[in-house]
Each structure stands twice: as C-alpha cells, then as structure tokens.
Amino acid sequence: MFAVLKREFRSYFQNVIGWLFVAALMALFGLYFYVYNLRQGYPYLYYTLSAITIIFMIAVPILTMRSFAEDRKNKTDQLMLTAPVPVAKVVLGKYLAMLAVFTVDIAVFCVTPLILRAFGTIPMGESYIAILAFWLYGAASIAVGMFISALTESQVIAAVLTFVVLFISYMMQSLTGLISSDGNWLTKILNCLDLYAPFEKFQGGCLDITAILYYAVSYTHLRAHETS
C-alpha cells in the first residue's frame, strides 16, 4: 500500500496535475483570505473556506479523473487485479496519495490562523475546526471522484461526472427545499446525499461528531464499491 501511495503521490508532481491542483486552491484561498480576513477583518476562516468551495469542486475532478480511468483505458487495471498486492490496498494507496496532495494545501491553510493572531485575538479553536471540516469534506469529495473514475475509461467523462455529482450535492439543500419542507422520506434520503451540509455544521466552531461519522461512513461505503 505504501509503495502505491509513494508512486502515485510522486506521479502527481511529475506532471502538471498535482502542481495545478495545489497552486489553484492555494491562490484562491490566499485571495479570499486577504479580502475577508486581512482587509475586512473577519476573524473566522469558515467564510474563506466556503468561498473556495466551487473552485474546489472544479479542482477535485482534475485530481481524481485519472485515478482509475487511465488504468482502464490502458488495460493496466487487469495487472492490478492479478497483482500479489490486494486490490483494497491498491485502492487505498491511490486514495491516500490524492488525499496527501490535498493535505499539502491544508497544511498551508493551518498557518493562516497564526497570521491572523498577529493582528489581534481570534478564535483559534474555531478556525482549526473549520479547516478540519474542509479537510473532511475534501476527503469525501475525493472518494466520490475516485469512485466515478473507476466506472469509465474516459478521464474527461470522469471529470465531468464528478463535478456534476459534487455540484448537485452542493445544491441539495436548495433542491430539497423546492421539493418539500415538511421533512418527508424523499427529502430525508436526498439530505443523506448532501456532502456539504456536514461541513456547514462546523460553522459555529462546534466539533460535530455526527458530521465526522457521516464523512467516515461515506468514504467507507465508496471504497467498498471500488474494491468490489
């Protein structure tokens, strides 16, 4: 598994994909951090992280589109199935490599509360909880993109479908509001597909255990389908 992780992680930075993902996310975060937190004086990072969500939904498909689609197109997926390494470990290695690329950005984000602290008192705990929530949301989004990539040979189709799924999930609260407001069974099912809502639960700086469990269950369910 660790050999797969290292190989995949290295491959992302041997071409433009890894650098593009890290740079784009970091640049947009830096822009909103400057506007919201430094210029306008907001002490909370939640608003900055929320502002880059749409860009993140565009960046994730670019990162995940080749995870399995490229193997299926080149027919190298058969080698993975017959390799002495269990398929589950190969899948986990690929996933952790993409998560590590995303974590490069998160590591930089973790420095920003310290920058704000130099200008005055800020809610440090709430800031780091917001970063943790965004990391969990990103981890679930990457799992979705990886799952979709395993369904097709085309990287373009994988990228487009991943964005569509993430965008629909992002808009799920609005969509369920149009369907019904009385909390019927349909809205409850649709709310289970909303990856973004658990992230919003961290807005007040509360470490919501149910949101963490939701992301953990989502990841486990998607990985089980990838290895089956």
Mark where each language-model region is.
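Aromatic- and glycine-rich beta-strand/loop motifs that create alpha-glucan
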Residues: 1-18
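Secretory targeting signals
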Residues: 29-34, 45, 55, 97-158, ...
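Long, hydrophobic alpha-helical segments
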Residues: 48-70, 105
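Helix-loop-helix units of permease transmembrane domains in multi-pass membrane transporters
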Residues: 67-97
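Hydrophobic alpha-helical transmembrane segments
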Residues: 19-22, 128-132, 159-160, 212-216
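Conserved small/polar residues in nucleotide/adenosyl-binding loops
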Residues: 220-227
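Transmembrane helix segments
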Residues: 32-35, 152-203, 207
